């Protein structure tokens, strides 16, 4: 996604877009976020698997649900089973959280901010929302990542 994509979408009649997760802060600044929504919290997909984890384990219930899997170093990843089409979405082990980047986000001036929830428990949702409403308060009391916002893809 780049300024040419943004211009194409504008000509096609789209008035708003969600800022691409792959771009870092300086790339987002060049792109311009005046008509964009910027995701500031949420577990991001890292992989879509065409093989169902539950089916492979012989535990398929044909009901979409969430489960977890660990990688070789013991990091736990949230996995959403999509039984309607027999595939899985594997999410990053830590959620994106840009609350500690308040000043930089204000300078980017996105039209709106998105807080995206998936499998969080009620208490977690409340905690994250309180921090977001508190204008990106202090460092959160949970593990998080800032993904590409600071370092970019390359």
Each model region followed by its residue ranges:
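Active-site pocket-lining/capping segments in soluble small-molecule metabolic enzymes
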Residues: 1-154
